Amino acid sequence: MIPFNAPPVVGTELDYMQSAMGSGKLCGDGGFTRRCQQWMEQRFRSAKVLLTPSCTASLEMAALLLDIQPGDEVIMPSYTFVSTANAFVLRGARIVFVDIRPDTMNIDETLIEAAITDKTRAIVPVHYAGVACEMDTIMAIAKKHNLFVVEDAAQGVMSTYKGRALGTIGHIGCFSFHETKNYTAGGEGGATLINDRALVERAEVIREKGTNRSQFFRGQVDKYTWRDIGSSYLMADLQAAYLWAQLEAADRINLQRLSLWQTYYDALEPLAKAGRIELPTIPADCVHNAHMFYIKLRDNDDRSELIAWLKEAEILAVFHYIPLHSSPAGEAFGTFAGEDRYTTKESERLLRLPLFYNLAPVNQRTVINTLLSYFG
């Protein structure tokens, strides 16, 4: 079976993990954590990067940092992973879902302002497939209405919008290093990017269980104590060691994924020109990271038939999110603002193909040939 995904392995992970074990410090904020954070701060030009156990934890940390309260409203797309919404629902917020653009599957920036009320506190754009939302417009709306922007850049590590790294444009950015992402911290992991310097000190406190422990270890205070609400949002240094191996190879991983992505695009473009499928759209201002390659079929039935065809050929291709607003929790905790023109319809057409760093060219060719044979 050709899998849909396999975690990236570059070859130096075990050496670094053994080094972490030999250091005598396996908990958070060890040497490998500092290396990873500094690398991202310099590479992506973020004021402060803090490793977390997951992107879910990073989003929860953002909700705490913005002091989201019961009754507050947070705007986001419905076509996203449940963690995007849950982080704010846990604080008592009401989620306001906005329709997506069919070209990028990202939130439609032209519909955001109409969804704003006097209860709105934040906008959470989700960079689907590592392709940027229209951030200039979103940031202008946020500034006009005095709102925070939290970028869910779980899929966006190494992608850019007008030359700026995704996750560094909003007030806060959230990365994922889950095993399904381009880079992993040994299976689970994330990072919070603090781009508003006024939020940095409190972010460190919230991440360290509500204490000023980080200041204590830097020698800024002679003891640390409970200062604020918080939780344990540190990544173990053993995981950071795995991640460091991946970040050292980040450019190599990125180029390989882009090559695989382009191979799919070139091979399937004739089908798109013939009107049999639709291919991903990359806007001119966006540089993507080849996180995902998807095609769109005519409808849900057509997609189901193709999934079965590929499965018969020992190829695993998968659909993606069920829109949150149609779920029981989405109905309880959220509201869809305006018309659902594209969210549900487009989600039922989208099919993701196998794409991962270690995908062998012969296996990718098998996927392509099987697809071409399906369409005759």
Regions found by a protein language model. Give the residues of each.
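PLP-dependent aminotransferase-like
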Residues: 64-153, 160
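PLP-dependent aminotransferase class I/II
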Residues: 34-39, 43-49, 110, 114, ...
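Structural detector of well-ordered beta-strand residues that form the stable sheet scaffold
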Residues: 50, 75, 96, 149-150, ...
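N-terminal "arm"/small-domain region of PLP-dependent enzymes with the aminotransferase-like
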Residues: 1-26, 225-227, 354
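Active-site PLP attachment segment
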Residues: 168-212, 237
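Conserved active-site segment immediately N-terminal to the catalytic lysine
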Residues: 151-186, 215-216, 222-227
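Phosphate-binding glycine-rich loop
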Residues: 26-73, 87-91, 97-99, 164
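Hydrophobic/aromatic ligand-binding patch that stacks against planar heteroaromatic rings
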Residues: 86-88, 141, 165, 182, ...
